[in-house]
Amino acid sequence: MAKTIAYDEEARRGLERGLNALADAVKVTLGPKGRNVVLEKKWGAPTITNDGVSIAKEIELEDPYEKIGAELVKEVAKKTDDVAGDGTTTATVLAQALVREGLRNVAAGANPLGLKRGIEKAVEKVTETLLKSAKEVETKDQIAATAAISAGDQSIGDLIAEAMDKVGNEGVITVEESNTFGLQLELTEGMRFDKGYISGYFVTDAERQEAVLEDPFILLVSSKVSTVKDLLPLLEKVIQAGKPLLIIAEDVEGEALSTLVVNKIRGTFKSVAVKAPGFGDRRKAMLQDMAILTGGQVISEEVGLSLESADISLLGKARKVVVTKDETTIVEGAGDSDAIAGRVAQIRTEIENSDSDYDREKLQERLAKLAGGVAVIKAGAATEVELKERKHRIEDAVRNAKAAVEEGIVAGGGVALLHAIPALDELKLEGDEATGANIVRVALEAPLKQIAFNGGLEPGVVAEKVRNSPAGTGLNAATGEYEDLLKAGVADPVKVTRSALQNAASIAGLFLTTEAVVADKPEKAAAPAGDPTGGMGGMDF
């Protein structure tokens, strides 16, 4: 495909036009009085959202240079969303301000590399200041306030705070669509995984279609169980102990399954067989998690243990096990708390070292099952369009609340960034680097000014008033009052604020140091087929 090339100012201005087109669509959503954006979908109903990254993903521009500029800013929003779960609109507004001021200085003759170094040093200083000023999140109310700011709804904030209170900071909180109107919270005690009983004959509660085992032994096997002679010695010992048995194995089939079912129907012995979750190495790891949680051991040839020689001491224990056709829940496993803590620490290390989003997500799920629990928020709404928008807001708010617990909170509403400006005076920079720091100084006011503008206030007046206020005091755009924002519950996770700034600065540096842009040349649409003489081709008169 043929390429088109732009140089110098033409290249940079083309990229900036694309950035502005995207940023102008995104920034109208910033703050409590921000508006929504309607996104047309090729199929189905349109989506209504105020989420920066969702809007950014939908924008495709026609001009090749503008398209590249927009793609670069999409990367800012996506990276911020990946790291912090929120702050995508703030990141876009900061990127726009940094690029605008930066290009103005480049056009005036400043060295782009000097500006880039100055911007990087200034951002590092501001990040350090933000982290120092962050307050730890200690109360349920603080979590609720932070989540409510993200979702724009206090009831959502309260529900997320309750969910985190129940499952712990490491617990998994998932959001599901509900057929009923409103919000509901469902909690899962202990470890739950998505595998149910192998045979319906194991059911103990016909009405609920559940198999419930009280105080059972738990047999964990890494291979298939098919012959009854392998299982019999252990079964006899369990029957003598007078307890039910849960078997979790790669599969239970043939004679072994028949024997268990027949004994269950006759009332001789209560048991349930379940397939182990996952595949390959992940299955082995999850079985090991269950072994540590229940105080048992995985029967595996790899560690020199076989089923026929297994002893009752290798079995795990739990207070209760509930098995449905789709899932199994182990409540209060009898594992050693130190061993569980060690396993949790090991999984945390694996999460930090993993560079795959999918692996990280699966490790996080394992961590939650061991360390906390699982909470499901069920969201309902009057229409499908509203339901999707609400679900998305709740998911963002959950990640926001977790980010707040992780690194602490700072004053929201763009105030923390503006109040970090004096820290730049400590930098002793000269020449173009000093100019780069001044670009950051101007850009740090942009989020507050945009929030004020969206709230119908004069941005310059608001910025001046906040600049002269004590640290942490600023505009509460929801009420129009100037107050201590942390006390008023207007807080942002510092992780969100710093990620937005760092990612915006990264892309701004690329914009400023760009000297040429190579893009695909737009193809001209082919003329419709027809008779070149103007008649109807192929017709005979």
Curated annotation (Swiss-Prot):
Keywords: ATP-binding, Cell wall, Chaperone, Isomerase, Nucleotide-binding, Secreted
PROSITE patterns: CHAPERONINS_CPN60
Single annotated GO MF: ATP-dependent protein folding chaperone
Cross-referenced Pfam families: Cpn60_TCP1
Assigned EC number: 5.6.1.7
Residue stretches in coiled coil: none
Localization per Swiss-Prot or TrEMBL: Secreted, Capsule; Cell surface; Secreted, Cell wall
Catalytic activity: ATP + H2O + a folded polypeptide = ADP + phosphate + an unfolded polypeptide
Domain of life according to the entry: Bacteria
GO cellular component, one term: extracellular region
Annotated ATP binding sites: 29-32, 86-90, 413, 476-478, 492
Chief site of localization: secreted
Gene Ontology biological process terms, A to Z: protein refolding
Role according to the record: Together with its co-chaperonin GroES, plays an essential role in assisting protein folding. The GroEL-GroES system forms a nano-cage that allows encapsulation of the non-native substrate proteins and provides a physical environment optimized to promote and accelerate protein folding.
HAMAP family, sorted: CH60
Subunit structure: Forms a cylinder of 14 subunits composed of two heptameric rings stacked back-to-back. Interacts with the co-chaperonin GroES.
Similarity field: Belongs to the chaperonin (HSP60) family.
Protein's UniProt name: Chaperonin GroEL 2
Species for this entry: Mycobacterium avium (strain 104)
Lineage: Bacteria, Bacillati, Actinomycetota, Actinomycetes, Mycobacteriales
